[in-house]
Amino acid sequence: MADLLLGVNIDHIATLRNARGTIYPDPVQAAFIAEQAGADGITVHLREDRRHITDRDVRILRQTIQTRMNLEMAVTDEMVDIACDIKPHFCCLVPEKRQEVTTEGGLDVAGQVDKMTLVVGRLADVGILVSLFIDADFRQIDAAVAAGAPYIEIHTGAYADASTVLERQAELMRIAKAATYAAGKGLKVNAGHGLTYHNVQPIAALPEMHELNIGHAIIGQAVMTGLATAVTDMKVLMREARR
């Protein structure tokens, strides 16, 4: 089974910084520490309201990240312009609502295939690999293929939020079937949202998974153990799940 990659989302380093309007903690320093600890990539979400990561952060990170930069962003003209200028290695297109605390669901690709095709094409034209953040739904997977995206990221929020063992098993099965279906269509399959040290291994064990993007749990654990240890511990769990 291929190695499973870990993308560390550092948005909440910026959340902590912005809570006091200071210049620390610095997302750039956090990215460096995460990479040194084994992160395979760094993910940041430049939201329309700039509530955590800022344009300046994105530009500096693009110049300093030594692995791969994954820019999460809404499907807007402004964000596409920024991405085409900065040229991160990856862009993950996500739905976005200003009032939400965090991304609440997957992107409705099936309802806007023409628009998504144009955006995917525009990003691809400048060398950016595009991922679509979608629910574990065959219809959305088919739409991602139609739009020309090489990657999808399966939204694992319902799995993470399941309140019973039976609910979690049902969500895991749904994700597993979607991952198999997507891989059969030629897509690279990533996953993320709500993954923690306690629930990551069943997702990590799915053979089709290429990369997991994890942020809040790692940054939360970093408060207790330090960022390097938090990243390393997550990598260990992911490796164990693949044995």
Swiss-Prot record:
It is an enzyme of class 2 (transferase). It comes from the Bacteria. CDD domains: PNPsynthase (cd00003). It is found in: Cytoplasm. The keyword RNA-binding does not apply. Pathway: Cofactor biosynthesis; pyridoxine 5'-phosphate biosynthesis; pyridoxine 5'-phosphate from D-erythrose 4-phosphate: step 5/5. GO terms for cellular component: cytosol. InterPro entries: Aldolase_TIM, PyrdxlP_synth_PdxJ, Pyridoxine-5'_phos_synth. The record marks E153 as: Transition state stabilizer. Pfam families: PdxJ (PF03740). The active site is at H45, E72, H193. 1-deoxy-D-xylulose 5-phosphate binds at D11, H12, R47, H52, T102. GO terms for molecular function: pyridoxine 5'-phosphate synthase activity. Catalyzes the complicated ring closure reaction between the two acyclic compounds 1-deoxy-D-xylulose-5-phosphate (DXP) and 3-amino-2-oxopropyl phosphate (1-amino-acetone-3-phosphate or AAP) to form pyridoxine 5'-phosphate (PNP) and inorganic phosphate. Belongs to the PNP synthase family. Homooctamer; tetramer of dimers. This is Pyridoxine 5'-phosphate synthase. It comes from Yersinia pseudotuberculosis serotype I (strain IP32953).
